[in-house]
Amino acid sequence: MKIFLDTANIDEIRQGVEWGIVDGVTTNPTLISKEGADFEKRIKEICELVQGPVSAEVISLKWDEMVEEARKLASIDDFVVVKIPMTPDGIKAVKILSAEGIKTNVTLVFSANQALLAAKAGATYVSPFIGRIDDNGNDGLRLLEEIMQIYTNYGFETEVIAASVRHPMHVVEAAMIGVDIATIPFDVLKKMFLHPLTDVGIKRFLQDWEEYKKNKK
């Protein structure tokens, strides 16, 4: 499984890259606005740090405006993946952009039907929002299973990104069914390192080592 960071914060991205476990980054207008940074400069900076796919989202809602905006975003860096909303206009834009070789990530996906249409249009990635689905009383994991089965049945090359990840178990559940990518908030990524027995074990090793040194004197 590939791990993307869902953030526009440079310090978080730098830390993830230093850990050696981050394959890409996803951003959205909300994340960028929180940073108070220039949009294009921040996307370029992230691309230089990660050296992997970096999703940057269009603001337009009409297909022709999406295409124009997507071309500009794609020109920022070769690593840019253009996020397109799951709408009829969005799918039309994805079809055009895919034919031009521009990588796309269809976002705000909440059903297998939507994921099927995104793959048919040639999307590079599709992002089901599993956390929001769970929040709404439905089963985000079940949606991932449906999408993975459909893509396997027909040999679609579109990669699935588990998005709207709320906790480490979302990552485990996605990994167990073979989802290609999880895009993870930095706080959730940090939690993936943790287990109380690991802390207990480290403490015990250190205590034993100190005891050993005392006995050697």
Curated annotation (Swiss-Prot):
Record field: catalytic activity: D-sedoheptulose 7-phosphate + D-glyceraldehyde 3-phosphate = D-erythrose 4-phosphate + beta-D-fructose 6-phosphate
Known pathway: Carbohydrate degradation; pentose phosphate pathway; D-glyceraldehyde 3-phosphate and beta-D-fructose 6-phosphate from D-ribose 5-phosphate and D-xylulose 5-phosphate (non-oxidative stage): step 2/3
UniProt-annotated catalytic positions: 83
Any single GO BP term: pentose-phosphate shunt
Recorded GO MF terms: aldehyde-lyase activity; transaldolase activity
UniProtKB keywords: Cytoplasm, Pentose shunt, Schiff base, Transferase
Assigned EC number: 2.2.1.2
First-listed, main subcellular location of the protein, grouped into a coarse class: cytoplasm
SUPFAM superfamilies: Aldolase (SSF51569)
Places the protein is found: Cytoplasm
Pfam hit, one: TAL_FSA
GO CC annotations on file: cytoplasm
Transferase among keywords: yes
Protein purpose: Transaldolase is important for the balance of metabolites in the pentose-phosphate pathway.
Family recorded in the similarity comment: Belongs to the transaldolase family. Type 3B subfamily.
Protein name: Probable transaldolase
Originating organism: Fervidobacterium nodosum (strain ATCC 35602 / DSM 5306 / Rt17-B1)
Name of encoding gene: tal
